[in-house]
Amino acid sequence: MNKNTQGKPSGKPVRRDGVDPVLRSRARRRAVQAIYAWQISGGNAQSLIAQFAHEQAREIADLAYFEALLHGVLDNRRDIDEALGPYLDRGIEEVDAIERAVLRLAGYELRYRLDVPYRVVINEAIESAKRFGSEHGHTYVNGVLDRAAVEWRKVESGH
């Protein structure tokens, strides 16, 4: 077994920093689902975290990252929504619930998780929007995040 995959649940190579990209992708997908459920139910964030964390653990995904994403979005929702505002063509609450969950998650990662390259954030958001959202939701998500990334990650995006 390759030393880069030894003991890693996905069996795929990990980056030098020890991050398994497959597990991170799973954590993001589950976080989108949890954010969506939270938006729809208006329920208790802690019970949603507990429910999804239990399911996350069964899938051998990156539980710590899932929890960090979910707490990050819920704790910073107002800031994220306000920051996304100039890049939206309508109010955040008028955006489809799935696309809104995807945008909030990606907005959190773009603003607060500078260790994650902006292209990774955008690509993962597009994939989540394709998987869970409406037929053309991914193009909307891409447009919003491309414009936001230029401002929020100027050094990284080269602008």
From Swiss-Prot:
GO terms for cellular component: cytosol. The keyword Transcription applies. It holds the Pfam family NusB. Keywords: RNA-binding, Transcription, Transcription antitermination, Transcription regulation. It comes from the Bacteria. InterPro entries: NusB-like_sf (IPR035926), NusB_fam (IPR011605), NusB_RsmB_TIM44 (IPR006027). One of its GO terms (molecular function) is RNA binding. CDD domains: Terminator_NusB. GO terms for biological process: DNA-templated transcription termination; transcription antitermination. Belongs to the NusB family. Involved in transcription antitermination. Required for transcription of ribosomal RNA (rRNA) genes. Binds specifically to the boxA antiterminator sequence of the ribosomal RNA (rrn) operons. This is Transcription antitermination protein NusB. It comes from Stenotrophomonas maltophilia (strain K279a). The gene is nusB.
